[in-house]
From Swiss-Prot:
It is found in: Cytoplasm. Belongs to the SmpB family. This is SsrA-binding protein. It comes from Burkholderia mallei (strain ATCC 23344). Residues 126-142 have a biased composition (Basic and acidic residues).
Amino acid sequence: MSIIDNRKAFFDYHIEERYEAGLVLEGWEVKALRAGRGQIKEGYVVVKHAEIFLIGTHISPLPEASTHIKPDPVRTRKLLLHRDEIKKLIGKVEQRGYTLVPLNFHYKGGRVKCEIGLAKGKKLHDKRETEKKRDWEREKARIMRSAT
């Protein structure tokens, strides 16, 4: 079950591979995500010192958040992957012009996971082509409905 989706990622990038990563979250962040108070549209993934971090995601704290903790909604969050997956991703990101983008947050066994995609940026003409295909599919569906 998906908590938050990043639909903009599919419009801006060609997603070639997907990986599921664990997230290092604080308690108030998990509660806020359960309430649906997160946004990953502007988020991106970076590699630092052979570790992978999620930057730019916004998780708004609940008003009932603890009083002794100052919540930071846009803090950097560490992603948890196997070492060989990290090495593979580092190699592709550094050599072949790929980037890593967060695709969604979802639950797996009661824990919050982040699906990240190994992606290449689309050019403007690719985006237009995608839009034309989507419009044509809608038009075909409309024609088929009216014909029957």
